């Protein structure tokens, strides 16, 4: 800390200002404001971050000393002002907690009560937000014994004012001789760290990470230092290196990583104007600019900054693992430790952990750098890797070069890992953690820490890839197998499960390079297969899966699965049942690993429907596609059978059906046709809109809520309906619009609530929806007032220009309008209003929300129920949608079309 820094705080000038003023508050506030401005200017000019946070602590020391001196403490008074916690370490960011302990010799606080209260009031009045406690030395001991947080804070302390002997006594009575011996402290801190990591999903790669608390954050470094302080009495990284826990290169890496996070945290506090440790989307762009990250556009600079952030926290996490493992071996070493048990000529088992026989194992036999992970997968009783062996891996990974990558011993070992029954994900994660995976597969190294600036992909590409493999493994076990019953069943029957793991490893490996990542990944996957001498059939399947890993999700979410031609086209891509099984399992795992909160029962239903229909098509033979007329006849026959059994007059049914047209029977099941028909025939002529609601959930975790509306057609029907559903907090995922020859509309919507779940067995909610829709359709003039709702915080940071493409369908007499736009409340209602203004009719819609982006497909016709044929009309329609959905007052970030 500086001894003198008059620019930051001039003691003489401050004392003079205090003497001139009747109240000291103004002088204190002025000094605090000026100091903040000075430090912020120094930060922007590139001043060393360690100096900045130490300078702020020094300044606060001076302010507190001056504030303390405003009160009459006798020179021999047994009371001291002590800095604890981060402030006790001498580290303060702009809005860090200023933790203070007012330390007394005696538990009798009364003699100092008035002065203490007035001192704390002064701190509050001058704008310092402090965390304070008032304790005697004995009370410190009592509370520290019971509370891990208290003992941790007291270990980091400095006397700011008053006698130092009080703090020394406090340290003595809270030492390891009296409480929290090293072993207990380590176990408690390790458990605390695990709980904290779990809170952040056990990953460094959250979309909005916490710079302090997330895995690999500043708290992990502090945990290392706390344990070291308790065990060795040292409290800095260099001292750790002196104890042999860090080599010099590791010490330098940890120190530089800490300083990078300090810069990020300082910038966060400065920009937020408050204590803020979450790297929110609100601040990522500004911090990227502030720290000098550049790119062709804002999105690229953010991604460059975040990739650097993720790689830094990965480095911290790696070293934290190593040091914590080192501590465990030293602090928890049993007194009667059993001798190591040999595993083979290169490795042995030491207290449950694998370690190299000697320091030259990886130098003499480099293939052992892959063998160690295969051994851990083959021997699940192995708890992990000894610290010295982790360090040896890190020190020898430079030996992984092209010769290593083509050595048949290494290629065989790598493939062997994917054939293990358990431990594949765990050991791939270790390989990534220790920097081995990215060295062995340079193309994988490229995606490490690579983020995608959107709400759909909540993990970096490498974390998502390893998550996918984890979910593939877990599909064979409960509870995840219950959520994905078909995928789990198929996973257990795949002839070579290792192939889907390899396809999963490569499915997104082409991201971040210019071009179609599926095509780029397929090229890399083929090169991998050739290098690893996989059979031709295996190679073809892996390459095909990587190349087509998006096809199933795209077809299910963007195309009309009731159209036999859609199923036939997809079946022609798949060709055989084996590919279909592999692709379905990969697709489910991919979507769920991308963002589990965006997986919902309707997506599950669509994928199962596409799988089932394609399976039937493959059994029937690609040369024998379903005939539309035959499908219509089968649906009508089955529906009529249901109705007649229930006592419905078949002549009335035939009369109703004659008004509906072929599309109605292609888009609905026989059960739905019977349900609709029975209700329509019972509806009074003047009964108003008919609104039917039912669950279509056939299996747990699949389905949605179906809303069927039958009413006289009106031009604003769709606009009114979707506006009302928006007001009812319903998310539309599918819409089928039929207009009968008698000018009645038969609309079917599949909806979920805001949690991505169907409405379920909730009569009150069902009645609320029924009444809301009925009232809206009876009073259509009210609908424009109900489409305004506040845009959620995160969505505001993904403003990009809407994309609209319009083309006529080659198979059906409709025009296809594809929309990609920022998700906003009331978006469908706005679209409906535009269709109304352009005198267009909606025939069908596929609605997909992918994070902050909607990917919707609308099948429309003109006022004469014909496809659009006027290019100028199409151009005006495009312009109207783009103008209506553009965010005019927010910066635009150009974004590419999302892929799962």
From Swiss-Prot:
Lineage of the species this protein comes from: Bacteria, Pseudomonadati, Pseudomonadota, Gammaproteobacteria, Pseudomonadales
Q: Which cofactor does it need?
A: Mg(2+)
Question: What does the UniProt entry state concerning the protein's domains?
Answer: Has four distinct domains: an N-terminal nucleotidyltransferase (NT) domain responsible for UTase activity, a central HD domain that encodes UR activity, and two C-terminal ACT domains that seem to have a role in glutamine sensing.
Sample GO molecular function, one term: phosphoric diester hydrolase activity
Residue stretches making up the HD domain: 461-583
* One GO BP: regulation of nitrogen utilization
Q: Which reaction does it catalyse?
A: [protein-PII]-L-tyrosine + UTP = [protein-PII]-uridylyl-L-tyrosine + diphosphate; [protein-PII]-uridylyl-L-tyrosine + H2O = [protein-PII]-L-tyrosine + UMP + H(+)
Name under which the protein is recorded: Bifunctional uridylyltransferase/uridylyl-removing enzyme
Enzyme Commission number: 2.7.7.59, 3.1.4.-
Q: Which organism is it from?
A: Pseudomonas fluorescens (strain ATCC BAA-477 / NRRL B-23932 / Pf-5)
The UniProt entry's sequence similarity note says: Belongs to the GlnD family.
Q: Which InterPro entries match?
A: ACT-like_dom_sf, ACT_dom, HD/PDEase_dom, HD_domain, NT_sf, PII_UdlTrfase/GS_AdlTrfase, Polymerase_NTP_transf_dom, UTase/UR
Arranged from A to Z, the UniProt key words for this protein are: Hydrolase, Magnesium, Multifunctional enzyme, Nucleotidyltransferase, Repeat, Transferase
